[in-house]
Swiss-Prot record:
InterPro entries: ATPase_NBD, Heat_shock_70_CS, HSP70_C_sf, HSP70_peptide-bd_sf, Hsp_70_fam. Residues 617-644 are annotated as: Disordered. GO terms for molecular function: ATP binding; ATP-dependent protein folding chaperone. NCBIfam families: PRK00290.1. The gene is hsp70. It comes from Oncorhynchus tshawytscha. This is Heat shock 70 kDa protein. Belongs to the heat shock protein 70 family.
Length: 644
C-alpha cells in the first residue's frame, strides 16, 4: 500500500457518469478524459469490430441500442428476480438474462453472443477511469478508493469491490458517496468548530442522505438513509413515457417497441430535463423519429414537476429518517449541502429549502465532482500522504443496515445496529433450543424488520459437534466483525469445546467466487489487448489511406506540371487508385495487410518522389513522408457520428 506503486486515485463509480480525481501537490485534481470532459458516461458498447467505453459508447447508442450497456450499478449485487431488476428491464434496450439466479447482460460482440456479469461491465468502466488517470499522471496507477451509495447493502459493496479487482485495481477502501462529498465540503470550508452537516446526494440512479458532525478534521457520520434506486434516470423515464403517449395521441403509432426510436427520445428527454433546470420550457425536436415522422414538441417546467412530483416529494422521507436516527432536530443542522447532478432541479431545491424553513442551501461544491474529490483525499490518506491538509483527517463512517442472526421462532436478533460507527466488533452469547442439540445453524441477516423472513439473508453456516447437554446449557459465542469497507465477517465458538466456525459473507448471495474473479481478470486483459489491436489496425489503415490520397494529390497538383513525367505521374496515380479501391473492399483487413500495402505503395512512389526532391521539384508542404509520421501514431481518422 505504499506510494511506491504510483499515486492513489479516487473513483466515483456512478450509475450514469463516473469521475476520477487524484490528490497531489497539496490539492485535488479532477481529471478530464480524452474528450476533455471531467465526467465520463458509465457506458460500455460492443460492436462487430470493437468495444467502446465512455463518451464513445454513449455517442453511438442510438445506432446500437441492443449492445450498449449502461446502469450496471442498478444490477450489481442484486438477484435476477429482485423486483427492482425486473422493473428496470422494461426500460433497458439491452437483454438481461438469469444465470443461476444472478443477472447477466447479453450482447453481440464481434459476431458472437457474449454474456457479462454486472461486475465485469463496471470493471470496464473502472479500467477506463484508471486509464484516464494514467494518461494524465504519465505513470501506472494501481491503488484506488471507490465510492458506493451509503445505502448499498453488503452484497452490493462486495460486488463493487470485486469489479475493482477485475479491473486490476488494489481497492484501498470502499467509501460512502455522501461521506466522500462531506470530506470535499469540509476541506473546502476548513472547519474548526463543530458543525452538523446534512449531505443531500441525488445522482443519476441513487439517492443518499447522510448527517455528519465535522470538527477539526474529524468527520463523524451520525446517520444515513436513502434509496438505492432513485435518481435522474427515473425522471427521464417519466418524460419518455409521457412523450410515447403523446406520439400515440398525435400520430396513432406506438414507438415503445422500437429501441432506436426510444433511445433517441430518451437522449432528447435527458437534454430537455437539463434545460428545464435553467429555463421554464424546453423543446424536443427529433427528425424522422419513427416511420419517417418528425416529432416536434415541448414541455414546461411546471408539467415536468407535476410528472415527477411523487418522486421529488419522496426525497424528503430519507431526510426525516436520517434526522430521527441522528436524534437531531432540523434546526440543529448548520449546513445543507447539495451533491449529485439531479440536485440542480429547482423543484428539488425548493422542497428541501422549504423543509428547512427557508434556509439557504449550500451549493459551493461542484455536485458532479464532489464525491470523486473526497475519494481522492481518502485515497491519499490511506496510502500515507503526509500533506499537512490531509494528515489530521479522520473519517468515522457507519453501517447503513442492522446486522444480526436468526433466533428461535424466526426472530431477528441484531448484533450490530444500523448507524453503528465502523469498523465495529460485537459479541453475544447464545444457547441451544432443544435438549442434546448436536449443532446450531447460524443464519446471518441484514435489515430493520423484527422477523428474519422480512430481512435479507446474507449467508449461513453450521457449528456442529456440540456435546450432548440439556437445552440452555451450551454457550455459543457469536462475533460480528464489520470492517471499514462495511463488509462483514461472522464467527461462532462453542465455549465448552473451543470449536469454531466462521464465514466471510460471500457466495451464498450471488457473490463471485475467487475462480470467477480470476477468470474475469484474464478476460479483462484479453479484451484490453483486443481493443489495443483494433486501435493499431485503424491507425495502420488510416496511414495507408492518407498516404495514398496525399501521393495522388501531390502528383496531380498544378505546381507539378512539367516537373514530373507523364509516365511517373500515371504510375503513381494508378497505384494510388488501386490501393484506394483495395481499401474500400478491405475495411476489415489486418494491421499486417495494411502495412504490407503501404510498403508496396511506397516501393512505387518513393523513388519517384525522391527523384523529384533531387530536382527540387517537390512543392513545399507536400508531404512525401507523411505516412511515416502517422503510422506509429494511434491517431484515428475522423469518427463523427450523429448523436441523437
Amino acid at each position: 500500500m505504499s506510494s511506491a506503486k504510483g499515486p492513489s486515485i479516487g473513483i466515483d463509480l456512478g450509475t450514469t457518469y463516473s469521475c476520477v480525481g487524484v490528490f497531489q501537490h497539496g490539492k485535488v485534481e479532477i481529471i478530464a478524459n480524452d474528450q476533455g470532459n471531467r465526467t465520463t458516461p458509465s457506458y460500455v458498447a460492443f460492436t462487430d469490430t470493437e468495444r467502446l467505453i465512455g463518451d464513445a459508447a454513449k455517442n453511438q447508442v442510438a445506432m446500437n441500442p441492443n449492445n450498449t450497456v449502461f446502469d450496471a450499478k442498478r444490477l450489481i449485487g442484486r438477484k435476477f428476480n429482485d423486483q427492482v431488476v425486473q422493473a428496470d428491464m422494461k426500460h433497458w434496450p439491452f437483454k438481461v438474462v438469469s444465470d443461476g439466479g444472478k443477472p447477466k447482460v447479453q450482447v453481440d460482440y464481434k459476431g458472437e453472443n457474449k454474456s457479462f456479469n454486472p461486475e465485469e461491465i463496471s470493471s470496464m468502466v473502472l479500467v477506463k477511469m484508471r486509464e484516464i488517470a494514467e494518461a494524465y499522471l504519465g505513470q501506472k496507477v494501481s491503488n484506488a478508493v471507490i465510492t458506493v451509495p451509503a445505502y448499498f447493502n453488503d452484497s452490493q459493496r462486495q460486488a463493487t469491490k470485486d469489479a475493482g479487482v477485475i479491473a486490476g485495481l488494489n481497492v484501498l477502501r470502499i467509501i460512502n458517496e455522501p461521506t466522500a462529498a462531506a470530506i470535499a465540503y469540509g476541506m473546502d470550508k476548513g472547519m474548526s468548530r463543530e458543525r452538523n452537516v446534512l449531505i443531500f446526494d441525488l445522482g443519476g440512479g441513487t439517492f443518499d442522505v447522510s448527517i455528519l458532525t465535522i470538527e477539526d478534521g474529524i468527520f463523524e457520520v451520525k446517520a444515513t438513509a436513502g434509496d438505492t434506486h432513485l435518481g435522474g434516470e427515473d425522471f427521464d423515464n417519466r418524460l419518455v413515457s409521457h412523450f410515447v403517449e403523446e406520439f400515440k395521441r398525435k400520430h396513432k403509432k406506438d414507438i415503445s417497441q422500437n429501441k432506436r426510436a426510444l433511445r433517441r427520445l430518451r437522449t432528447a428527454c435527458e437534454r430537455a430535463k437539463r434545460t428545464l433546470s435553467s429555463s421554464s420550457q424546453a423543446s424536443i425536436e427529433i427528425d424522422s423519429l419513427f416511420e419517417g415522422i418528425d416529432f416536434y414538441t415541448s414541455i414546461t417546467r411546471a408539467r415536468f414537476e407535476e410528472m415527477c412530483s411523487d418522486l421529488f416529494r419522496g426525497t424528503l422521507e430519507p431526510v426525516e429518517k436520517a434526522l430521527r436516527d441522528a436524534k437531531m432536530d432540523k434546526a440543529q443542522i448548520h449546513d445543507v449541502v447539495l451533491v449529485g447532478g439531479s440536485t440542480r432541479i429547482p423543484k428539488v431545491q425548493k422542497l428541501l429549502q422549504d423543509f428547512f424553513n427557508g434556509r439557504e442551501l449550500n451549493k459551493s461544491i461542484n455536485p458532479d465532482e464532489a464525491v470523486a474529490y473526497g475519494a481522492a483525499i481518502q485515497a491519499a490518506i490511506l496510502s500515507g500522504d503526509k500533506s499537512e491538509n490531509v494528515q489530521d483527517l479522520l473519517l468515522l463512517d457507519v453501517a447503513p443496515l442492522s446486522l444480526g442472526i436468526e433466533t428461535a421462532g424466526g426472530v431477528m436478533t441484531a448484533l450490530i445496529k444500523r448507524n453503528t460507527t465502523i469498523p465495529s466488533k460485537q459479541t453475544q452469547t447464545f444457547t441451544t433450543y432443544s435438549d442434546n442439540q448436536p449443532g446450531v445453524m447460524i443464519q446471518v441477516y441484514e435489515g430493520e424488520r423484527a422477523m428474519t423472513k422480512d430481512n435479507n439473508l446474507l449467508g449461513k453456516f453450521e457449528l456442529s459437534g456440540i456435546p450432548p447437554a440439556p437445552r440452555g446449557v451450551p454457550q455459543i459465542e457469536v462475533t460480528f466483525d464489520i470492517d471499514a469497507n462495511g463488509i462483514l465477517n461472522v464467527s461462532a465458538v462453542d465455549k465448552s469445546t473451543g470449536k469454531e466456525n466462521k464465514i466471510t459473507i460471500t457466495n451464498d448471495k450471488g457473490r463471485l467466487s475467487k475462480e470467477d474473479i480470476e477468470r474475469m481478470v484474464q478476460d479483462a486483459d484479453k479484451y484490453k489487448a483486443e481493443d489495443d489491436a483494433q486501435r493499431e489496425k485503424i491507425a495502420a489503415k488510416n496511414s495507408l489511406e492518407s498516404y495514398a490520397f496525399n501521393m495522388k494529390s501531390s502528383v496531380e497538383d498544378d505546381n507539378m506540371k512539367g516537373k514530373i513525367s507523364q509516365e511517373d505521374k500515371k504510375k503513381v496515380v494508378d497505384r494510388c487508385d488501386q490501393t484506394i479501391s483495395w481499401l474500400e473492399n478491405n475495411q476489415l483487413g489486418d494491421k499486417e495487410e495494411y502495412e504490407h500495402q503501404l510498403k508496396e505503395l511506397e516501393k512505387v512512389c518513393q523513388p519517384i518522389i525522391t527523384k523529384l526532391y533531387q530536382q527540387g521539384g517537390m512543392p513545399t508542404g507536400c508531404c512525401g513522408d507523411q505516412a511515416r509520421t502517422s503510422s506509429g501514431d494511434s491517431s484515428q481518422g475522423p469518427t463523427i457520428e450523429e448523436i441523437d
